[in-house]
Curated annotation (Swiss-Prot):
Keywords: Cytoplasm, FAD, Flavoprotein, NAD, tRNA processing. Its cofactor is FAD. This is tRNA uridine 5-carboxymethylaminomethyl modification enzyme MnmG. It comes from Rickettsia akari (strain Hartford). One of its GO terms (molecular function) is flavin adenine dinucleotide binding. It holds the Pfam family GIDA_C_1st.
């Protein structure tokens, strides 16, 4: 009988990262998905990255994940979002050729060491003594394993809505999974419903682009992966149009036919990626909403109209689309729809993504209440790493709010839970100036090397980059001019008679890399080198980063301050009954986690610390 150390159920963005990470750690891994086309399928928009999301992709890449490298084999429109603002909120993004993305992902996974792929459907999980034992396929055959990672996306009791029409499906033309939903309910997991949606797809050959605005990509695409030197995929343009008052009138007149507004849908949709119906209702004073016309491939005429996700009936969808400039004669290739699905309250999992109820069972992706490819992939890689480390009886791998966006996301989910699809934003991170897309590898790759999840190829690239940073830093500390000479170049510095190095000059608010190259022409060769920009950012924001590091040190000290499992909060008289009940319910394992529970006051935290010092004066927990 076949037996695996780790089985991953689901071949979406969470599943492929989980399976690959597990396999990289040397344990036998099986990835089960319905069909080959499902591997890395982009169910909704054909793009990777964005504000905060791009940082997640860079972090996945830093841990030797697949997403960054694969998008570099398929990216057809690269754009750095928010580049006119500070580097903490820069958002690398790339439009993808769907076919190229799936092709690259398939080629990688089907040749991955320690990884097998099975095309089939899992109906049940065999559990013995509150521990996973095997998966059960729809033909009743069993495959034993030590660990299971569920990455089911929108397939758990999935239900598509188009107007009043309901179609049981995990996505278009694919069956939902009822068996696994039943299993999770039987075990006693807290399950609820969420909703997401997608816009209609349209034929680009029938668009009048003269009525739209051109949206070019960056002149020089910046790769996501440290393994990619240059993006060799041809680059194309996107276009922008907008809704009109006529569009809005049609939607308002037909709101009662929308599955979302008729009461037909129970699940809560994503707050920050609303349907067009939701936009018209929530932002009723706006006269127009932008629509991004995004090509789905180099040799594919399908266009993804980003911004008009809808669950309106077929006839209404056709009607409203034709009121949009440039789309008056457009042909609809596929209708938009909403989809409802089951998810599990993420407070049912620990920060390793292992469930608290069942040993050896891990959740990653939309099953935990998140939305987005990048959020799913970030969870997948952590679940895969921890499942494999558990098989090897090694310490678990935990990212924190202080070192990664992935850590912020997991901490938010496991501490607060979510009642709506969770999306990553830069504003969710207290330390976003330190957790930038450009330094993801410097933050995380060494951690990955320490646990053995990083390939030799990436290890060499990382080591070389680290050496190059030190060499460049040394050079920038060597190149200098006197303040008087700099003044003659119209560079405003205090005339104290000292020499100013390039790194000193970078700290001047108005001074930039282009000026440095003008003064020191030898830096021109490094202009396209990410290292020069990295050091520029580090120097420019040095004082802020120093203060933020102090905050991080305080955070880490609180995270290290453990709370015993058997603590009785009702024996701490100086905190209110409400707070005692909250702490007893959440069961935080550290002072840091306790502080982040909504409603827990600073005074209560002080009381807990004093209580622990008094009761456990010898530093031991009983």
């Amino acid at each position: 009988m076949l037996k695996y150390d780790v089985i991953v159920i689901g071949g979406g963005h969470a599943g492929v990262e989980a399976a690959a990470a597990s396999a990289r750690l040397g344990v036998s891994t099986l990835l089960i998905t319905l069909k080959p086309d499902n591997l890395g399928e982009m169910s909704c928009n054909p793009a990777i990255g964005g504000i905060a999301k791009g940082t997640l992709v860079k972090e996945i890449d830093a841990l030797d994940g697949l997403m960054g490298y694969v998008i570099d084999q398929a990216g057809i429109h690269y754009k750095m979002l928010n580049e006119t603002r500070g580097p903490a909120v820069w958002g690398p993004r790339a439009q993808a050729d769907r076919k190229l993305y799936k092709k690259a992902m398939y080629q990688i996974l089907t040749n991955y060491p320690n990884l097998d792929i099975l095309y089939g459907k899992v109906e049940d999980i065999e559990i013995k003594s509150s521990k996973v034992a095997a998966i059960v396929l729809n033909n009743d055959s069993k495959i034993p394993c030590q660990k299971i990672i569920l990455t089911t996306g929108t397939f758990l009791s999935g239900l598509i809505h188009i107007g009043k029409k309901k179609i049981p499906a995990g996505r278009v033309d694919e069956e939902p999974s009822y068996g696994l939903s039943k299993t999770l309910k039987k075990v006693g997991f807290k399950i609820a419903r969420l909703k997401t949606g997608t816009p209609p797809r349209i034929d680009g050959r029938t668009i009048d682009y003269s009525k739209t605005a051109l949206q070019p990509g960056d002149k020089a695409p910046r790769p996501f992966s440290e393994l990619t030197n240059v993006v060799n995929v041809p680059q194309i343009n996107c276009f922008i149009t907008k809704t009109t008052s006529e569009t809005h009138d049609i939607i308002r007149e037909n709101l009662n036919k929308s599955a979302m507004y008729s009461g037909q849908i129970e699940g809560i949709g994503p707050r920050y990626c609303p349907s067009i119906e939701d936009k018209i209702v929530r932002f009723s004073t706006k006269s127009e909403h932008r629509i991004f016309l995004e090509p789905e491939g180099l040799d594919d005429y399908t266009i993804y109209p980003n911004g008009i996700s809808t669950s309106l009936p077929e006839d209404v969808q056709h009607k409203l689309i034709k009121t949009i400039p440039g789309l008056e004669n457009v042909k609809v290739l596929r209708l938009g729809y909403a989809i409802e699905y089951d998810y599990v309250d993420p407070r049912e999992i620990s920060v390793t993504l292992e469930t608290k109820k069942i040993a050896g069972l891990y959740f990653a992706g939309q099953i935990n209440g998140t939305t987005g490819y990048e959020e799913a992939a970030g969870q997948g890689i952590i679940a895969g790493i921890n499942a494999a480390l558990a098989v090897k009886d090694q310490a678990q791998f935990i990212l924190t709010r202080a070192n990664s966006y992935i850590g912020v996301m997991i901490d938010d989910l496991t501490t607060f839970g979510t009642i709506e699809p969770y999306r990553m934003f830069t504003s969710r991170s207290e330390y976003r100036l330190s957790l930038r897309a450009d330094n993801a590898d410097l933050r995380l790759t060494e951690l990955g090397i320490n646990i053995g999840v990083i390939s030799e190829k990436r290890k060499k690239i990382f080591t070389k980059k680290y050496e190059d940073i030190e060499k460049t830093k040394s050079l920038l500390n060597t190149l200098s001019f006197t303040t008087s000479k700099l003044a003659k170049m119209d560079i405003q510095v205090a005339q104290d008679g000292t020499y100013k190095t390039v790194l000193d000059l970078f700290k001047i608010p108005s001074f930039n890399i282009e000026q440095a190259i003008k003064i020191f022409p030898m830096l021109k060769e490094m202009q396209n080198n990410n290292i020069l920009q990295l050091l520029y950012i580090e120097a420019k924001y040095a004082s802020y980063l120093t203060r933020q590091q102090a905050d991080i040190n305080l955070f880490q000290s609180e995270e290290a301050q453990l709370i015993p499992k058997n603590i009785d909060y009702f024996k701490i008289p100086s905190i209110s009954l409400e707070i005692q009940e909250k702490l007893s319910s959440h069961k935080p394992t550290t002072i840091g986690l306790a502080r982040r529970i909504p409603g827990i006051t600073p005074a209560a935290i002080t009381s807990i610390i004093i209580y622990l010092k008094t009761k456990y004066s010898d530093g031991s927990f009983t």
